[in-house]
Swiss-Prot record:
Coiled coil: none
Reported cofactor(s): Zn(2+)
Official protein name in the record: UDP-3-O-acyl-N-acetylglucosamine deacetylase
EC number: 3.5.1.108
Keywords in alphabetical order: Hydrolase, Lipid A biosynthesis, Lipid biosynthesis, Lipid metabolism, Metal-binding, Zinc
Pathway: Glycolipid biosynthesis; lipid IV(A) biosynthesis; lipid IV(A) from (3R)-3-hydroxytetradecanoyl-[acyl-carrier-protein] and UDP-N-acetyl-alpha-D-glucosamine: step 2/6
Entry's Gene Ontology BP terms: lipid A biosynthetic process
Family recorded in the similarity comment: Belongs to the LpxC family.
GO CC term, one of those recorded: membrane
Keyword Acetylation: no
Function: Catalyzes the hydrolysis of UDP-3-O-myristoyl-N-acetylglucosamine to form UDP-3-O-myristoylglucosamine and acetate, the committed step in lipid A biosynthesis.
Catalysis: reaction(s): a UDP-3-O-[(3R)-3-hydroxyacyl]-N-acetyl-alpha-D-glucosamine + H2O = a UDP-3-O-[(3R)-3-hydroxyacyl]-alpha-D-glucosamine + acetate
Gene responsible for this protein: lpxC
HAMAP family, A to Z: LpxC
Amino acid sequence: MIFQQTLGNKATFSGIGLHTGKTITLTLRPAEAGTGIVFHRVDLAPAVSIEAHASNVVNTRLSTTIGRGDASVSTIEHLMAALYGCGIDNAHVDIDGPEVPIMDGSAAPFVAAITKAGVKVSGKARKYLVVKKPVTVVDGDKKATIIPSRHYKISFDMQFAHPAVKSQFRSLEFSQESFIGDFAAARTFGFLAEVEMMKSHGLALGGSLENAVVIGDNGVINPEGLRFQDEFVRHKILDSVGDLSLTGHRLIGHVKATKSGHDLNHKLVTELLKRPDCYTLIEFTPQAFNAPFNIGIPELSWLEA
């Protein structure tokens, strides 16, 4: 799809905030082409609007938080992943609290509601951010790189020193079908000892076995077990889709991440956006859409398929 899209109708959610433990209601509304994704804290007087963009990220501890002045909205990554995954470029997000509801810990409830609301196609072309040169950020043993590629792809190498998790690797070559079918339902996860520690410090107050995979000393303690054998790394890729959508554009490039999280994802997006020599923005015509690298991009021979 080369044209910008929004929702066909409204979609409303109500649920618990993972960290605040408070019930929050959120409504997605259609928006005009060129709007982007804009959150509105409607519980404040006057309401405060915050564009979902990397320049508005104010915190990446445990989740991704955007803010403006004293107002903020946290835990936006699952909703942002669902919007990107369903092809939604423009939407208003009315929210009556400081945190997006965690729902079941995945993007699946958001995807289902967006799918039910339908999609409206505009006549305005999308802008694709096409990576021209590699960009890398490193933090200790954590690393994230985005390199030129003919497609949008995320490859994630996850490593934990725990027998139930250990190392997991998976790649997503992005399409709406692959994201919705293979990644949207992967749930957030945490270690029991860390969850108990966070709750003692006033965090993760809404966390439960209903909205997260919890890992104890001997493995997953959720009675239903895992939705996928490698659900953990699938969820890390889901988070990455949401965090990387804060470029404000559809992406064409290959992200390679090792032990990355919200903070490093944000640093990668920020580093990319401040280096205009490393990317180009393209509005594709129908004729050019299937051959993006013929437009102002160097030789193709070294690019990944």
